[in-house]
Structures are given as structure tokens and as C-alpha cells.
UniProtKB/Swiss-Prot annotation:
Keyword Repeat carried by entry: no
PANTHER family: ATP-DEPENDENT RNA HELICASE DBPA, ATP-DEPENDENT RNA HELICASE RHLE-RELATED
Disulfide bonds: none
Native source species: Leishmania braziliensis
SMART domains associated with the record: DEXDc, HELICc
Pfam families recorded: DEAD (PF00270), Helicase_C (PF00271)
UniProt region (Disordered), positions on chain: 1-29
Stated name of the protein: Probable eukaryotic initiation factor 4A
Record field: catalytic activity: ATP + H2O = ADP + phosphate + H(+)
PROSITE patterns in UniProt: DEAD_ATP_HELICASE, HELICASE_ATP_BIND_1, HELICASE_CTER, Q_MOTIF
UniProt motif Q motif: location: 26-54
UniProt GO MF annotations: ATP binding; ATP hydrolysis activity; RNA binding; RNA helicase activity; translation initiation factor activity
Keyword annotations: ATP-binding, Helicase, Hydrolase, Initiation factor, Nucleotide-binding, Protein biosynthesis, RNA-binding
Family per record: Belongs to the DEAD box helicase family. eIF4A subfamily.
Length: 403
């Protein structure tokens, strides 16, 4: 599918229209957007706004705080990128927008989207820069000295350059927290609150995520002012276009079952999720020995190696990516049509993030869960949480891959 066909599948009726001022606007031309921003939107490949874009962009441009929930693959990054770019004054080469992401890979991907959509707004091709771990701080300081309008980064590095006085926060207009549920979890919460200490009191705050647990919504009261809320009904929290199945299997037979799957059907690209680094390495080694083109990554790898792996997978040079939950959030690879949970995720929210790797932007996709006897209860919890049914894998499942 071409970029021009990017219309997200999330249903109009999936949203809780519980707040005034949230109404779908079915055309980018009808939104309050600069002409040069519209040029960038259409040049990027968007034609018709997705459901979340129809609802979130206009409230974003009005300058108030916003909490927006949208499933993976439904145009969430485009929604906040467009809203953010409309809010900035490109006559001034000052830092005005800050986007925080939980991983280096997601930050790099987000910065690319913002740069491409905003290419006709700025005279500088470098108006949007990334600030992430695994790179030299001195390089970041040089970027800031040269002038940046939008900074996209991970909390640790952004906090560092703020404390050094290199990233001046007084001119900031907008803060976006992408994958907000992860950003406000225990792992990042302290860093996020530390960054907030340096931000202008009147800064616009926008939260975007596929899941918005109640505890996260409760936390937002600490730093948001009467936000517009665009939330998805719980029963809608499963991806259209994704067929979900399970295979009952004993732990020691999972690898053989995996090999059988790859011999049964032709798969464009696939992602296999396992819960430990050791298991990721083991699965990748066994698949490589069977002449599959396999990449693998996990959080303990150097960030430069992880970036190289993602580039290899995106380019199609590698057909299989074996990983931990590191890439479960937001990494956009267009040709993935099957996701295999070699291990079920320990976190129910991560199930949705994982299966969102397949069937993006309305294409068919399949999610297959390997379920041992001890996993049955967790599978039922996932079904109950998302009001969905996960059926046993049928013999003719190749039909679900569009074969």
C-alpha cells in the first residue's frame, strides 16, 4: 500500500465523545492549518485524515492541553506532528516544541515525520533535531547552538541538556508526551517530573498513547489544565484488520511450532516477541540456522546496533525481527503482516502495542499467540480486558495473510 492510501481503520464510533469541542473534521483543508503545512501533509502522502487526526488536530491547534488515545497504526504520530507544527512560529529560530519518546528508535522515527511534514514551513532543513542517549552530548550542544525549533528526544538526554543550560526552555510553547502511559510509568516518571520543573508554567501539554489506564489519567491532573480528552471505548481497543489466534503448545515445543509456521506460508515480514534477552538470541540463532533472514534486538544491545537492526528490517533486507517489548511501541514497519507472541506479554497493555505491528493502515494482518497451559488464564485476562475473542489457529490461516 502506498503512503497515499494511508487512511487509518479506527471506527468513528470507537471514541468516547464526552467533551465539547471534539468533533471530527473530515478534510485537512477544512482544518485551521497554514498553507505550507498543508503542502507538507500532502507531500508526505496523507490524503484524508484518520479518525484520530479528524478529532485531535483542531483542539491541538487551539492551544489547550489535550489527552488523545489512538491505537497503533492509526495516524497518531501524524496527528500530534501536524498539531505541533501549526502551533509554532517559524519566523523565530528558537526552540518552541519538545516531544518526549520512551525509546531512541521511536524518537528518530518521530523526528523524521515532523521534519518531512514541516519541510515547507522552515528555511532550515535542520529545524527538528533528536536528543537521545548513545550519542555524544557535544554533538547535541552544537545542534542547539546552531538553532532548533523542535526537539525530539528521550527523557534522560533531554533532562541532561536542559540542566546544562544548552536547551533553553523559556521559549517552549508545546510539550508532547508520546506513548504517555509508558512515559508516566515508574521507569520515566521521575525524569518527566524533573523536566517539568524547568518548563514555562503556561506550556501546552499534549499526551498521546494507544492505552490510557486510569492511573495515568489520574497522574495527569498534576500538570495539565482542563485537558480536552479524546478517549477510545474499552471495547474498541483491539485492532481492526488484525486477526488474532492462539496455538496451544508446550514450552519445549514452541520452537518446532514456530519452524512449522514459517514452512507453511509465505510471510512478507514478521515480528516475533519473546520476554527475555536470552530467548530472543536463541530464537534468532535457530531461525538463522534454518536459512531465514533474521534480525534481533533487545534493550541490552548498544543503541547504535539497535538502530542498525531497525534500518535493516525496515529496508526489507531482513524478513524476521525477534525482539523483546523494546519495539512494541510505535515502530512503523509497513510490510509486517504477522506478529508472533512466542511468549505472551506480562503486561496486558503491551499486548495491544505488540499486535499493532501487523496490518497497519488497514492492511490484513495476523497475530498468533503461543499459549502454554500456565498461560491460559492470562489469555482470558487479555480477552476480557479488550472485550475480544482470540480463537484457535485454523488450518487455513494462510487465507488471513491475503494469500
Amino acid at each position: 500500500m502506498s503512503q497515499q492510501d494511508r487512511v487509518a481503520p479506527q471506527d468513528q464510533d470507537s471514541f468516547l465523545d464526552d467533551q465539547p469541542g471534539v468533533r471530527p473534521i473530515p478534510s485537512f483543508d477544512d482544518m485551521p492549518l497554514h498553507q505550507n503545512l498543508l503542502r507538507g501533509i500532502y507531500s508526505y502522502g496523507f490524503e484524508k485524515p484518520s479518525s484520530i487526526q479528524q478529532r485531535a488536530i483542531a483542539p491541538f491547534t487551539r492551544g489547550g492541553d489535550i489527552i488523545a488515545q489512538a491505537q497503533s497504526g492509526t495516524g497518531k504520530t501524524g496527528a500530534f506532528s501536524i498539531g505541533l507544527l501549526q502551533r509554532l512560529d517559524f519566523r523565530h529560530n528558537l526552540i518552541q516544541g519538545l516531544v518526549l519518546s520512551p525509546t531512541r528508535e521511536l524518537a528518530l522515527q518521530t523526528a523524521e515525520v515532523i521534519s518531512r511534514i514541516g519541510e515547507f514551513l522552515s528555511n532550515s532543513a535542520k529545524f527538528c533535531e533528536t536528543f537521545v542517549g548513545g550519542t555524544r552530548v557535544q554533538d547535541d550542544l552544537r545542534k542547539l547552538q546552531a538553532g532548533v525549533v523542535v526537539a525530539v528526544g528521550t527523557p534522560g538526554r533531554v533532562s541532561d541538556v536542559i540542566k546544562r543550560g544548552a536547551l533553553r526552555t523559556e521559549s517552549l510553547r508545546v510539550l508532547v508526551l508520546d506513548e504517555a502511559d509508558e512515559m508516566l510509568s515508574q521507569g520515566f516518571a521521575d525524569q518527566i517530573y524533573e523536566i517539568f520543573r524547568f518548563l514555562p508554567k503556561d506550556i501546552q501539554v499534549a499526551l498521546f498513547s494507544a492505552t490510557m489506564p486510569e492511573e495515568v489519567l489520574e497522574l495527569t491532573k498534576k500538570f495539565m489544565r482542563d485537558p480536552v480528552r479524546i478517549l477510545v471505548k474499552r471495547e474498541s481497543l483491539t485492532l481492526e484488520g488484525i486477526k488474532q489466534f492462539f496455538i496451544a503448545v508446550e514450552e519445549e515445543h514452541k520452537l518446532d511450532t514456530l519452524m512449522d509456521l514459517y514452512e507453511t506460508v509465505s510471510i512478507a515480514q514478521s515480528v516475533i516477541f519473546a520476554n527475555t534477552r536470552r530467548k530472543v538470541d536463541w530464537i534468532a540463532e535457530k531461525l538463522n540456522q534454518s536459512n531465514h533472514t533474521v534480525s534481533s534486538m533487545h534493550a541490552e544491545m548498544p543503541k547504535s546496533d539497535r538502530e542498525r537492526v531497525m534500518n535493516t528490517f525496515r529496508s526489507g533486507s531482513s524478513r524476521v525481527l525477534v525482539t523483546t517489548d523494546l519495539v512494541a511501541r510505535g515502530i512503523d514497519v509497513h510490510h509486517v503482516n504477522i506478529v508472533i507472541n512466542f511468549d505472551l506479554p506480562t503486561n496486558k497493555e503491551n499486548y495491544l502495542h505488540r499486535i499493532g505491528r501487523g496490518g497497519r493502515y488497514g492492511r490484513k494482518g495476523v497475530a498468533i499467540n503461543f499459549v502454554t497451559e500456565k498461560d491460559v488464564e492470562l489469555l482470558h485476562e487479555i480477552e476480557g480486558h479488550y472485550h475480544t475473542q482470540i480463537d484457535e489457529l485454523p488450518v487455513d490461516f494462510a487465507a488471513y495473510l491475503g494469500e
